[in-house]
From Swiss-Prot:
Its cofactor is Mg(2+). Isopentenyl diphosphate binds at residues 88, 120, 139. This is Heterodimeric geranylgeranyl pyrophosphate synthase small subunit, chloroplastic. One of its GO terms (cellular component) is chloroplast. Keywords: Chloroplast, Coiled coil, Magnesium, Membrane, Metal-binding, Plastid, Thylakoid, Transit peptide. Part of a heterodimeric geranyl(geranyl)diphosphate synthase. Interacts with GGPPS1 or GGPPS2, but not with GGPPS9. Interacts with LIL3.1 and LIL3.2. GO terms for biological process: monoterpene biosynthetic process. It is found in: Plastid, Chloroplast thylakoid membrane. Dimethylallyl diphosphate binds at residues 138, 220, 258. Mg(2+) 1 binds at residues 127, 133. Mg(2+) 2 binds at residues 127, 133. Residues 1-33 form a transit peptide. Pfam families: polyprenyl_synt. It comes from Arabidopsis thaliana. The lineage of its organism: Eukaryota, Viridiplantae, Streptophyta, Embryophyta, Tracheophyta.
Amino acid sequence: MLFSGSAIPLSSFCSLPEKPHTLPMKLSPAAIRSSSSSAPGSLNFDLRTYWTTLITEINQKLDEAIPVKHPAGIYEAMRYSVLAQGAKRAPPVMCVAACELFGGDRLAAFPTACALEMVHAASLIHDDLPCMDDDPVRRGKPSNHTVYGSGMAILAGDALFPLAFQHIVSHTPPDLVPRATILRLITEIARTVGSTGMAAGQYVDLEGGPFPLSFVQEKKFGAMGECSAVCGGLLGGATEDELQSLRRYGRAVGMLYQVVDDITEDKKKSYDGGAEKGMMEMAEELKEKAKKELQVFDNKYGGGDTLVPLYTFVDYAAHRHFLLPL
């Protein structure tokens, strides 16, 4: 459930620097080190336009993908979560950015990008249910089950999962994406949401047991980031080795954002500093892991504007109002 913490408005992404490598560092010397200083990209790359344009396109395509049909109630519940204001759109943006890294066509990536957001929304609907995490609020607004009831929320989530697969098959341009690639995309998403992915993480989160915290973080939060990056790589024509680098990158980013959210929440609750220090160290380690994988592409292809959006996922986490030890 990648980036499933508090809502972040589009303006927050717009506040990212247009030239990442010239980002002025306003944090204290003990602050988390940003990858911006080493991020590739030309002086002319307009990051703000990239993010706003891409998110606007994704929102439009998601709106078109889920029209209200009969019975209207279930479609309204589906749209409530998928089109929610404040949604970060991290999975679809990461997918498109990874596709474009390898020269892929954005038009080829949009159907899968939208499918990833549908799956992400479905997982959050189910996550918030009283029988799961019992969260009455999502992104500052009532959760799906709070508005529509638990029964309808379950149905809305159940409907979004197959709709995601259907959308990939019916909307992916056959002249841009081979059938074999479509099959791999579906397999990747199915693995992510199933008993070896997010479902496993949610199970352990519910039941506990002899599992390390990293297992829950990897399965429940890292899996969606991993899937988003890999799907983009598949659409862009990445090699198997490159897909593995994307897999490690996405997993690290997904886990990083959750750790950051946990740190922020702990600061609000004034927990003891010992646990917080451990989480800060974990966040720094995850950040470095994500950067390491991107540097593989930087070294291989000589950097360039196409890497900047993927670096910003790491940089944005690094500047979310918390400090890490050097």
